Amino acid sequence: MEAARDAQHSDVLESKGCLASRTSSHQNRRASLSSDGTGLRVTDAPGLPRVMTPSDTASGLGQKTSSTSSSSSSSSSSSPSSSSSAQANRSLKVSLPEIQKEKYPEEFSLLKSQTTDGQRPEWTFYPRFSSNIHTYHVGKQCFFNGVFRGNRKSVAERTVDKSLGKKKYDIDPRNGIPKLTPGDNPYMFPEQSKEFFKAGATLPPVNFSLGPYEKKFDTFIPLEPLPQIPNLPFWEKEKANNLKNEIKEVEDLDNWQAPMPFLHGFLSTANRTITTCDQKV
């Protein structure tokens, strides 16, 4: 009986020791969780091989990322200008595409900064002070090889007035008025011509009046409406003109003289020629 009691007492003690070891292991696990806060971590016995858990892998990755971020921050703080210049170069490469010069050769030939002799710029630059945009002036220099070509008219020039009308006759833009001065053209600039002031005024003078204007003082105030000026039709005027011509022909008959006879005139002229020849001989 005593031996059976001792066996039961030893079994109870063993069970209590297992429970105590289990509670201590649970407390150790809770302490490790509260201290790390990353995940589950199991402490195995020294004799058994260690098994990696998800918490270990996450902590390793966190250490790697922290080290890389610290290195990148130090490198960025050491060279901010190089990174900004690289980004600017990339943006320029993306935003400014290359222009094919072979596709549009005539446009590139016009934008020459200098002439063939390389002495003066061919295009003028006028900045717009009213805005922030600086653009090139429309057109080239006014003088080409020392010659102003703004007041020269080309032979191949055709205006709208010339293209209208009949084929045989051209429409005269001046309506028959001759040129009085060399610069009498609206599309030319005579002030740029050489010695333009010696030719006189650029505009034609007013010459449609024969004499100077004389101012007349008209103080007549009619008390009743004046009679209208008679305006006869054309057939009445033509009939009156024919009547005047007939009256004049009849009046000229009073001064009529008979013509000289033909034979008498012929003989008289022949005698005159014979006498002149005899005198010469």
UniProtKB/Swiss-Prot annotation:
Detected in pachytene spermatocytes and round spermatids. Residues 1-92 are annotated as: Disordered. Keywords: Phosphoprotein. Residues 21-37, 54-65 have a biased composition (Polar residues). The keyword Phosphoprotein applies. The lineage of its organism: Eukaryota, Metazoa, Chordata, Craniata, Vertebrata. This is Spermatogenesis-associated serine-rich protein 1. InterPro entries: SASRP1. Residues 1-14 have a biased composition (Basic and acidic residues). The modification Phosphoserine is found at S71, S74, S77, S78, S79, S91. PANTHER family: SPERMATOGENESIS-ASSOCIATED SERINE-RICH PROTEIN 1. It holds the Pfam family SASRP1. Residues 66-85 have a biased composition (Low complexity). The modification Phosphothreonine is found at T53.
